[in-house]
Amino acid sequence: MIDTLCRLLDAGVTQFHVVKKCEDILLDHDYRKLDIGERWELMAGGRYYVKPYPSMLVAFAIGEVPEYGRLNIGLAHTDFPMLKIKTQPDMNRCGYQTLNVEPYGGLIKETWFDRPLGIAGKVVVQTEDSFRPRTYLYDSERAMCIVPSLAPHLRKETTGDKMNVQKELIPVYGLNGQNVKEKDILQYVAEDLGLLKDDILDYDLYLYNMDHMEIVGAEKDMIASPRLDNITSVSALVDTMCKTEKGNCINVISLFDNEEIGSRSKQGADSVMLSGIVDRIMSGLERSEERRVG
């Protein structure tokens, strides 16, 4: 279990990366990917997963003699508090190139100061077919920004909820040198991906803490890491699905997005997606049984 957790904590820098890493782990344990838009024919003893959206995943393992309607379901969320990069984010402030950001989820704001921050998320790019844009998973894999703090004798006593993110939590990504003057942050992202900036149609990008997971304590019995909420739960569920034994149940996990902002999205826990997938699991088993008997 600890191995799965370590891999997810370091690789899961956004909800999209969490789902991609979970997908890789499940594929390594004989899970088969299903297409949400195709008909499913499922087999007793089979292992399957479906990814309705890039930040949501549902996996299920069917028992050898599954009892109709008997399911064990575990839930977790793939997102966590971050700083989200706004549209048209570049700002020049007092000779520094900065980004306009907004809080995503319940940030502990003080913890974002004076840390190396990477940029990650997804980038949507135009292709020759206007109706089929391509989505890239992006991770700068290097510290692109920092939110500097003031010395105690220079700052006001504003902490926690009183802190204004737009005024006091401003990420700096460059000095006002010639190179930075000629580029904005999307130019750097495009170069990392080997693309032209003008080909970028849209993006969903975040700043993330680049600190790595560490085992701490005299007995090495504690973990210090960013993103423990909620990757710990995601890791436990994925690890359980990898080790699940074949019985007479259908074991299901659903990893939702947007819990940090209320879950009321198409990929959130307040959607009808999971109930629809459970219905399709039952229907897929019925079709397989009819074909076997017939």
Task: Enumerate the language-model features and the residues they cover.
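N-terminal hydrophobic/helix-forming segments and targeting peptides
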Residues: 1-292
